[in-house]
Amino acid sequence: MKLSMRLISAVLIMFMIFVATGMGPVTVEARTCESQSHRFKGTCVSASNCANVCHNEGFVGGNCRGFRRRCFCTRHC
């Protein structure tokens, strides 16, 4: 009987810990909007160069993407 009470207690504590870890604060991520850069010229090869041009345009960052390798600027919607 003692062993089964310990086992039940241990299982109950593990269950409570498992449930408590999933109930933490939830952070909400902002959506990301994209727009093609107006000032970037040529084929986009360097993502850091694209990001610098996008920063000068007032965006948060930028990435090279697509088959034609264009620079797309990103910002929070």
From Swiss-Prot:
Protein's UniProt keywords contain Signal: yes
Signal peptide span: 1-30
What the protein does comes down to: Confers broad-spectrum resistance to pathogens.
**May I have one GO cellular component term?**
extracellular region
Q: What is the name attached to this protein's record?
A: Defensin-like protein 2
Subcellular localization is given as: Secreted
Q: Which family does it belong to?
A: Belongs to the DEFL family.
